[in-house]
A protein has these predicted regions:
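Bacterial Sec-dependent N-terminal signal peptides
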Residues: 1-28
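Glycoside hydrolase catalytic-domain context in secreted enzymes
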Residues: 18-725, 731-747, 751
């Protein structure tokens, strides 16, 4: 990170940190809240637990949102609804958002008995993606590749400012699911496959969103989601069933949520799917025993979209919708994204009147919801906050987005040092996504799917446009040969290569979100495979730029490419960042946050068990072992080289409650300045259950000038060596361990 960008982050941090006093979700409600609850009718209480979508009160006329006053009155006055969320079809300007939210709040405060302020909610998952003029960052999978906690926090902080400026104080983010199935269509929304990495990056994002004080006009309430096990569908499809033994659930999927609870995160969203045959929305064990009692979560639990209805219609664990409401509320949900009608409201009221749910149980949820509104400052300052509006647009935000995109880009291959390119090279820029904005942004970008090109602002640039701006005299373009359906004109494309020295092809997968992104396997698009093979016949070196939210199989085309850049979904500054890396204006430093598979049938994470590598040979029951992904977790090349000194330990034995200091010196032995990520892994050589081959325990990112060295220290304790045993207890067992840094290993003992 250069000094200029450090200065920009510092300036933004001063603005954000002005409200930096630590203020977590309140554990005890105030007398004010108790007084309100004591005066509320049952109907008013259940209304606070009801969350509807914007479509229930508004229509779109000539691309303009128009509030239906009669519907709004019905929702707010008759049914006492306390929160609304979402957009109709696409993003809105700040003024449009204000024209939506302010009338709702005005009616709520002027016409309801208790004047409980109204709360608006949104998915701002990689920036404030439903507000025009906002800054869109790389998706979480790209942010995880940066291995830069402070940068992730800064992206979250800017998102909070721009979301609050719209009048929205509740953000359905971040995703804390651990992405251990690379086929899953929401992998790009996760921070990767490792629970430590997800925990570290997730907490950084939460600190950015909430800032220690969500009453500040520059912060929002975060929502850790989707509790729990959502990212492990058995068939790789969104919202599909998962079979997760509890020992695995606790080892790999629970820690990120535990970390977020410890951080004081205000809300949580529930997994839409089911685990071991039980829908999580109906699991009292997970939502109450584990989440509330074990983890100590005090905040609001909200359903995902339509998920109580799905208990009846999809999971088929209740005969009626009313029974589904009974299951979910008794399991522990506080607020239901219904989202279209009042069936939840009506059935819940009936269940209380029938004595099947106690009113005290309703009071618990209402208490948490009102406390959330109080924490957000809604009781004191319910209307638009000018301070947030004034802070909406700053050059520093764009600089942060550019830096995040640059640091996320992962150089997977660079044969014979083809990259960086020089200004003298004549470069053909082509591929189905070279002149597209959708694939730079991916899901949740101005629309749910992010795939409506006309919705993207004119101020944003495609990769082809950046090439035209930066190197007009040496760039050659063949874009008309491609269509969005990946059809291509072979003759025209091959003709264009004749005057080129190097071919840059921008490929991967089209934008998608959630279930529409379901695929049968991770195969690369066959049309794109064909054209890469044809281009390779020209003898010109190929640079493949991958835009994708998950790792599509490139085994067949990798040999034809001299260099491969994985850009993930890099956001609004993605094209400029890709160009900067290609031409050496920025030295790539991204590290894979997942294992890049070689085959669709071999989706193994880096922290697998040794037996996962077993390959049967001729003799029965005799095995060799091999783990050969396309690229391993943590892989990422640089234009410079780094040398590691031998690992030094403060002792060869870690005793009881002591800590062990691990030191290594890293030297930039190349000619260029660069950033390096130092990752520390441990390996348990013997345990009461089969240990993982290694586990990530720490990482640090440093910047080194050519010839510069830095000493890096890690501290580990027995907790860093712990695992969940057969009794579901987290334990650290005595024995031999390895420390692994880069290609070095050193043994130590714990006793």
């Amino acid at each position: 990170m250069n000094k200029k960008h450090l200065h920009l982050i510092f300036c933004v941090s001063i603005l954000i940190g002005a409200y930096g006093c630590t203020k977590k979700a309140e554990e005890k409600p105030t007398d004010e809240i108790e007084k309100i609850i004591s005066e509320m009718t049952l109907e008013e209480k259940v209304g606070q637990m009801t969350n509807l979508t914007l479509a229930t009160i508004a229509n779109e006329v000539d691309s303009t949102v128009v509030i239906d006053t009669a519907k709004l009155t019905d929702v707010i006055i008759k049914h006492h609804v306390g929160s609304i969320q979402n957009v109709l079809t696409h993003a809105y300007t700040l003024d449009e958002w204000h024209s939506i939210i302010e009338p709702i709040q005005k009616l709520t405060l002027e016409k309801t008995r208790h004047k409980i302020p109204f709360l608006y909610c949104i998915d701002a998952v990689h920036g404030t993606n439903y507000v025009y003029g906002s800054t869109l960052f790389p998706h979480n999978i790209g942010l995880a590749a940066t291995r830069n906690r402070e940068l992730v926090k800064e992206c979250g902080a800017i998102t909070a400012i721009q979301t609050r400026a719209a009048g929205i104080r509740y953000n359905f983010a971040p995703v804390l699911d651990v992405g251990r199935n690379q086929q899953w269509s929401r992998l790009g929304e996760t921070f990767g496959e490792d629970t430590y990495l997800v925990s570290e990056m997730g907490v950084a994002a939460i600190r950015g969103f909430e800032g220690g004080d969500v009453s500040s006009p520059l912060h929002v309430a975060a929502c850790m989601k989707h509790f729990i096990g959502y990212s492990a569908p058995l068939n790789g499809k969104d919202r599909a069933s998962a079979n997760i033994p509890e020992i695995v659930l606790r080892e790999h999927y629970l820690p990120s949520f535990r970390a977020a609870v410890n951080e004081g995160t205000h809300t949580l969203m529930v997994n839409s799917a089911e685990i071991n045959g039980t829908p999580v929305h109906a699991s009292k064990y997970l939502l109450t025993d584990v989440l509330r009692t074990e983890l100590g979560f005090k905040g609001v639990v909200i359903t995902d979209w339509y998920d109580i209805v799905k208990l009846q219609e999809r999971h088929q664990v209740s005969e009626t919708h009313k029974d589904a409401v009974l299951l979910a509320v008794n399991a522990g949900i506080d607020m239901c994204i219904v989202p279209f009608d009042f069936k939840f409201t009506e059935d819940l009221i009936a269940l209380v009147k029938e004595g099947k749910i106690s009113e005290e149980r309703i009071n618990e949820s209402v208490r948490r919801i009102l406390q959330l509104k109080k924490d957000l400052g809604l009781f004191e300052h319910p209307y638009l906050e000018q301070e947030a509006v004034n802070a909406f647009s700053k050059p520093a935000y764009t600089a942060t987005a550019l830096q995040a995109a640059r640091e996320s880009i992962t150089l997977l291959k660079n044969k014979n040092g083809l990259l960086p390119l020089t200004d003298k090279s004549r470069v053909l820029v082509t591929g189905p996504y070279a002149d597209a904005l959708s694939e730079l942004h991916g899901a949740w970008s101005y629309s749910w799917q992010g795939n409506i090109e006309k919705l993207y602002p004119d101020s944003l640039h495609t990769l082809a446009e950046v090439f035209k701006k930066e190197t007009p005299s040496t760039s050659i373009f063949d874009l008309s040969a491609w269509t969005k359906s990946n059809a291509w004109n072979k003759g025209a494309l091959i003709q264009a290569t004749r005057s080129a020295d190097i071919i840059v092809i921008c490929a991967g997968e089209a934008a998608y979100a959630e279930t529409p992104g379901n695929i049968p396997d991770l195969a690369f698009d066959s049309s794109q495979v064909s054209i890469i093979k044809e281009l390779a016949k020209t003898g010109k070196p190929i640079v493949l730029v991958l835009l994708e939210g998950r790792p599509r199989i490139i085994r067949e085309i990798e040999p034809y490419c001299s260099a491969i850049l994985l850009a993930y979904w890099p956001g609004s500054q993605g094209a400029q960042a890709i160009y900067d890396v290609l031409y050496g204006k920025y030295n790539p430093s991204g590290k894979l946050p997942f294992t890049y598979p070689r085959y669709s049938g071999t989706l193994i994470t880096y922290d697998h068990k040794l037996l996962d590598e077993a390959i049967e040979i001729v003799e029965p029951y005799s095995y060799t072992y091999e783990f050969n992904p396309q690229y391993p977790f943590g892989h990422g090349l640089s234009y410079t080289t780094f040398e590691y000194s031998p690992i030094k330990l403060s002792a060869d034995t870690l005793v009881a409650n002591d800590s062990l200091k691990i030191s290594v010196k890293v030297t930039n032995t190349g000619k260029l300045a660069g950033q390096e990520v130092i990752e520390l892994y441990t390996r348990d050589m013997f345990a009461s259950i089969t240990p993982c081959v290694k586990r990530l325990r720490g990482f640090e990112k440093i910047n080194l000038m050519s010839g510069e060295s830095k000493n890096i220290d890690f501290m580990i304790s027995k907790n860093d060596l712990a695992f969940v045993n057969q009794e579901l207890k987290t334990v650290t067992e005595k024995g031999t361990f390895e420390i692994i840094i880069s290609n070095q290993k050193v043994v130590f003992y714990y006793k």
